[in-house]
Amino acid sequence: MEREHIFIIGPGRMGVGIALAFALHHFEVNLIDLKARSAEEYERVRKKAEQDVGSTLNFLRRIGRLKNSPEEIGSKISISHDLDKHHFEGSFIFEAIPERPDLKLALLRRISPCLRQDTIIASTTSTIDLKTLKAGLTHPAKLLITHWLNPAFIIPLVEIARTEETDADAVDRMKALLKRIGKVPVVLKDSPGFIIPRIQALAMNEATHLLEEGVATAEDIDTAIKYGLGFRLSVFGLLEFIDMGGLDILYYADEFLYSAFKNEKFKVPKLIEEKMKNGEVGPRTGKGIYDYDGIKVESLFEEKYEKLLKLLSLLEQGGPRS
C-alpha cells in the first residue's frame, strides 16, 4: 500500500505529537514552521521540536514500546520552514497552529495556491468551526477538522468533523489513513466543541465547582474520577452506561438534582423522557438508547465485568493508589 507523505504545519506539542503518531507507523513526515521568525528564533524552535521528538522516542524505548531505534523513527520526521520547496505534493496536510481564527485563516489562504485538488487538509482545532475556516480555501470541500487528544501519539481517538459540503471521499480517505496508524476515528457534524471537548468542559467545570463549594479536596475529587467514573468509562461508553444502569436511574437522578440545584444542566433530556414514556429503559426491556433484541443480557454484563477486572489488575500492579 502506498505511503502518503504527511505534512504538519505547526511544530508545537500537538504538531510534534501528530508527527510522532505517523512516524511510529513508518510514514515520512514534514513538520513545517511557517511563522515569521528570525533565523536564530527558527533554529531555536527547530531544535526544541527535535528534542521533543527525541526525548519521547527515548522514553518509549525505555518502557519497551518501541520496536525500532529512536534514531530510525526520528529520521522519518523532517523539520523545515520553507513552504516553496514542498508545493504539498503529499496527500494530507494537518494544520496545528495556535487556536486563533485569524491565524488559521491566514495560513489557509497562504497555502491554498500550493494545494492539489485532491489534497486533504485537516485543522486540529478543538473550538473553531468549519464554516469559519473554509473561507480560507479555494477548494473547501477537502477541508476537515481532525480533533486529536493529547498526547496525540498515544490516545486512539480522533474526531473528524465535516459539513454537508465536505467531500465524502475526503472523509473516507482520512478515516482509512487514521486507521492505518492505529487510531479510532469517529465522524460527526460540525458542531461547537465536537464530542469530547463539549462533554469534557462540563465535567471539568463541575469538578471545579465541587472544589469551590468545599465539597471535597482536589485530591479526593481526582481520586473519585480516576477510580470511579473514569475507570468505568474505559469499558462503558456514556450512553451505553445509561442503558446498562437503566434510563430510569438517570431520569430520577436528574429530577432530584434539578430540584436540589434549580439548574437547567440537570434537567431531564427530552430523549430520556420519551424513552421512559415508551418503557425503553435498557437491556432489561430489550431497548434503551441501543437495541438489545436478540442479545443475551447476562453475557453482555459478564463481558463488561471481565474487562473491568482486567483493568483492576493493571491498577493493582501499579502499587498503592493514594
Regions found by a protein language model. Give the residues of each.
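NAD(P)+-binding Rossmann beta1-loop-alpha1 motif at the extreme N-terminus of oxidoreductases
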Residues: 1-56
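NAD(P)-dependent Rossmann-like dehydrogenase/reductase catalytic/cofactor-binding core
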Residues: 2-4, 183, 189-190, 213, ...
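Structural/interface elements that position substrates and couple domains in central-metabolism enzymes
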Residues: 30, 183-184, 197-200, 204
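Rossmann-like dinucleotide-binding cores of NAD(P)H-dependent redox enzymes
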Residues: 34-67, 162-167, 194-200
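Rossmann-like NAD(P)-binding element
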Residues: 37-44, 59-120, 128-129
